[in-house]
Amino acid sequence: MTITMLKSKIHRATVTEANLNYVGSITIDKYLMDKANILEYEKVQIVDIDNGNRFETYVIAGEKHSGVICLNGAAARMVQKGDKIIIMSYCSLTIDEANKFNPTVLFVDNKNNIEKLTNYEKHGEII
C-alpha cells in the first residue's frame, strides 16, 4: 500500500503574469523549481490565497532568477497578477518510506526571492 505525501511546496509565491492565450500550465522560475525539488512537466496543485481557488496543472521551466510565476491557458482565469499562491507537488510512498520522508518547503518574498528553505512544516512554527 502507498499513501500520497507532500513532496514539495513553494509558499506564498506572487503571480507575476496570467497568460490566457498560452497552452496550459504554470511557468515557474527554474531556480525556484530546482530549490523546491519540482521537475518540469510535474503535476502540481495550486492554491490561490487571495480567492481560495484550488486547481491542478503541470510545470514548465521559466528563466532562472527571473522570479516568474505565470499561470497559462485556462488556469490564467483562476488567478490575477499579484495574487499569492501556494504551489504543491505530491509523491506516493509506502508507509515505511513516508515515516522517514520530509518534504521540501520553500518560502519566498513578494518578488519570489527565496527567504527560507526547510524540510518540514509544523503548525505554529513557520508563517
Curated annotation (Swiss-Prot):
Swiss-Prot/TrEMBL keywords: Autocatalytic cleavage, Cytoplasm, Decarboxylase, Lyase, Pantothenate biosynthesis, Pyruvate, Schiff base, Zymogen
Listed Pfam families: Asp_decarbox
Pathway(s) per entry: Cofactor biosynthesis; (R)-pantothenate biosynthesis; beta-alanine from L-aspartate: step 1/1
Listed GO biological process terms: alanine biosynthetic process; pantothenate biosynthetic process
Binding locations of substrate: T57, G73, A74, A75
EC class of the enzyme, as a word: lyase
Keyword Lyase: yes
The keyword Cytoplasm is annotated on this UniProt entry: yes
Residues with PTM Pyruvic acid (Ser): S25
EC number, UniProt record: 4.1.1.11
Residues at the catalytic site: S25, Y58
MF (Gene Ontology): aspartate 1-decarboxylase activity
Catalyzed reaction equations: L-aspartate + H(+) = beta-alanine + CO2
UniProt PTM: Is synthesized initially as an inactive proenzyme, which is activated by self-cleavage at a specific serine bond to produce a beta-subunit with a hydroxyl group at its C-terminus and an alpha-subunit with a pyruvoyl group at its N-terminus.
Cofactor(s) named in the record: pyruvate
Places the protein is found: Cytoplasm
Cofactor note: Binds 1 pyruvoyl group covalently per subunit.
Cellular component per GO, a single term: cytosol
Assembly, per entry: Heterooctamer of four alpha and four beta subunits.
Family in the record: Belongs to the PanD family.
Protein's job: Catalyzes the pyruvoyl-dependent decarboxylation of aspartate to produce beta-alanine.
Protein's UniProt name: Aspartate 1-decarboxylase
